[in-house]
Amino acid sequence: MTDRPVLHLSLPVDDLHAARDFYERTLGCRIGREREDWFDAWFFGLQLTLQLRPQEVKDVSQQGVRHFGVVLPSLTEFDELVHRVAASGHAWISKPEIHSDAELNGKLGGKLADPSGNIIEIKFYADSADYLS
């Protein structure tokens, strides 16, 4: 058990096997507890529960602004994840790019969706102080 709070998020999926493959192989998440209709994935410090709820799954086009994500601590980790996504053949919704406008200066980020349409943003900031400012 950890002495620090752990954030938990639960999302619907329509195919547990495809979800597990995506989170484990493509994103590199460690898989935790598993049951017939759900499993936990350790998503960069977040306990992510993927539940078989096909009736609750929405297409990416219906997600609007809804997404979750991670700010990776190093450019190396960001690049490794980008390469794993490329090797998996999984497409990006918005390919990783450097944002250079004043508000997002130095942010490197992209978005992709899991096989059930849950949108995930992957980010890296050149200056770690920027992501909470």
Please report, for each region that a protein language model flagged, where it lies by residue.
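N-terminal beta-strand motif that seeds the catalytic metal site of vicinal oxygen chelate
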Residues: 1-17, 47, 68-70, 124-133
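Short glycine-enriched loop/turn motifs at secondary-structure junctions
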Residues: 2-5, 61-65, 104
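Core segments of cupin and vicinal oxygen chelate
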Residues: 10-49, 53
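Vicinal oxygen chelate
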Residues: 16-17, 69-116
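Conserved catalytic-core motifs of GNAT/GCN5-like acyltransferases
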Residues: 30-36, 97-99, 124-129
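Short, flexible, solvent-exposed loop/turn segments with mixed acidic/basic and small polar residues
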Residues: 56-60
